[in-house]
Curated annotation (Swiss-Prot):
Pfam family, one: UspB
Topology of this chain in the membrane: Multi-pass membrane protein
Record's subcellular location: Cell inner membrane
Listed HAMAP family: UspB (MF_01088)
Keywords: Cell inner membrane, Cell membrane, Membrane, Transmembrane, Transmembrane helix
Membership in a protein family: Belongs to the universal stress protein B family.
Location (main, coarse): membrane
Segments on the Periplasmic side according to the record's topology features: 111
Protein name, per record: Universal stress protein B
Residue intervals on the Cytoplasmic side: 22-89
InterPro entries: Universal_stress_protein_B
Length: 111
């Protein structure tokens, strides 16, 4: 029988791997964005997005831009595909993180 603690740690590893995939896809999206829409790139602070001096309010703008699917009217097909991918990975990673939190609470209650 598989230990519940082992299952929890496996779920944590899967969540971390998906977070890494999400950030990698987001970085690739910013590269495409810099080439196809420099104004939007500046609007979401593309140059300082992954730095310590990045502006969180501008970073949240990109997240909401993708979450609300406002990219669908964009002229560049590559950008639209990247946004779709980032959106799917964001939803998957959010669900996995929620599952990790619920699993941690359940693990604390039962052990």
């Amino acid at each position: 029988m598989i230990s519940t603690v082992s299952l929890f740690w496996a779920l944590c590893v899967v969540c971390i791997v998906n977070m890494a995939r999400y950030f990698s896809s987001l970085r690739a999206l910013l590269v495409v964005l810099r080439g196809c829409d420099p104004l939007l790139y500046q609007y979401v602070d593309g140059g300082g997005f992954f730095t310590t001096h990045g502006q969180p309010n501008k970073q949240v703008r990109l997240v909401w831009y993708i979450y609300a699917q406002r990219y669908r009217d964009h002229h560049d097909e590559e950008f639209i595909r990247r946004c779709e991918r980032v959106r799917r990975q964001f939803l998957l990673t959010s669900a996995l993180c929620g599952l990790v939190v619920v699993s941690l609470i359940a693990l604390m209650i039962w052990h």
